[in-house]
Every structure is written in C-alpha cells, then in structure tokens.
Regions:
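Metal-dependent de-N-acetylase/amidase catalytic core
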Residues: 1-5, 24-27, 65, 76-208
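Active-site rim/loop-helix segments in enzyme catalytic domains that contact anionic ligands
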Residues: 1-93, 122-125
C-alpha cells in the first residue's frame, strides 16, 4: 500500500485540501494548533484547545490515519524551525507521496510550503520522496494574485464523506468554506477530470 504524508499548516487544512488521500496508510503532520506554545499536559485548562483536539480525534477515529502535532505558534511559524522537523518526519515515514499546501495569502501556508521545498530537496542523508503534490484551500479562491492554482492531477472524492468529516471539526467550520462551497469546488474539479466529484492537485514532482 502507498504511504502518504500530508503536511497541514493547521488542523482541518488536510480535510479541506486532500480528503481523498486520507486513509489508514496516511500520516498527517500538523504544524501547529494554537497561537501560543502549548503544554499538552495541561490542555484541560484550555477548553477551546481541548475541543479542537477532541474534534481531531473524532475525525481520526472515522478515517484511521496517524498524526503528530508540532508545538509551533500559529501565525508565527519560522521556516528555520520547520525544515529540520519536516526532514525528520520524511525520514521517519519515508512516504511514497508527499502533500504540501499551496502557498497563499496565509503566511503560515507560505512558510510551510517553503520549508517543505527545502526539506524534500535531493540530499545525501535524507529520504527522497518521488511524488510530491500541492493541495488547494477553498478559502484561497477569492484572490489568485499570489499563486494561481492550476491542478494537473485529480482524484475522485466522496464528497458527502468529506463534508461529514469536516463538520466533525465544529470549531473550525466557517461560512466561506461551508459544505455547499466544498461540494461546488469538487464539482468543478470533477468537470475538469470527467469525474462526478474530485479534488485537484498540482504536481510538483513525479518520479517513476
């Protein structure tokens, strides 16, 4: 079975951008989950954070992926801190496919993208990932001035399961990325790929 590694800047980015790639052979690395450094031993003192983690575990129980959360401050990611962490997880998982977020107006997404580019470079001591894909975020559609997403790879998605899983993350649901919008985007990607509903990706590297 193919091993997939998804690097998600925040909890829920993976559901929005590459739900079709998530299964029991998938490992998700969450770069951060809060705007402050977290002592996970004392998480119960933060009801909002506890809710977020409980929601994540509900989704994990449904989709059966493995995950790790890095203790970085959301909105304050530092590329020099992320590169060694990404190299570590790539070497640990040795994935067949790596998924990274599209760079966008969101500063965290840009930093994660740039750090991932460095971490996946050909290197004597690091594992070389042969297939690297960039996934999109529906909230980026309003403005393409930074990076115009042009999908060149498509995968069939069970859109009802995607929406159902996303709604388990109640604290993260927003009006500008609601179920109808997710379905509409999946329909557009489906039209582009002759599928009913699909997710689109940019191929950054594909080595056979």
């Amino acid at each position: 079975m193919k091993k997939r590694l998804i690097i998600a800047p925040h909890i829920d980015d993976e559901l929005l951008g590459c739900f079709s790639s998530i299964d029991e052979n998938c490992f998700i690395l969450y770069v951060g989950c809060d705007e402050s450094k977290i002592n996970f031993k004392w998480v119960k003192q933060r009801p909002d954070l506890q809710q977020r983690l409980d929601e994540l575990n509900l989704v994990q129980s449904k989709l059966h992926f493995s995950y790790e959360i890095l203790n970085n401050q959301v909105n304050s990611y530092v590329i020099q801190d992320l590169i060694p962490e990404f190299e570590r997880i790539i070497n640990k998982i040795q994935p067949d496919e790596l998924y990274i977020p599209v760079p966008s107006y969101n500063q965290d997404h840009r930093v994660v993208y740039e750090a991932a580019l460095t971490a996946m470079r050909p290197h004597d001591i690091n594992f070389f990932v042969k297939k690297v894909l960039v996934y999109e975020q529906i909230q980026d559609l309003w403005n393409h001035n930074y990076h115009e997403f042009k999908p060149t790879f498509f995968r069939l998605v069970d859109i009802e399961q995607k929406i159902e899983s996303y709604h388990l993350m109640k604290s993260q649901v927003r009006s500008f990325r609601n179920g109808n919008m997710l379905k509409n985007l999946a329909a557009i990607r489906g039209i582009q790929s002759n599928l009913e509903y699909a997710e689109g990706f940019e191929v950054l590297r594909w080595v056979e």
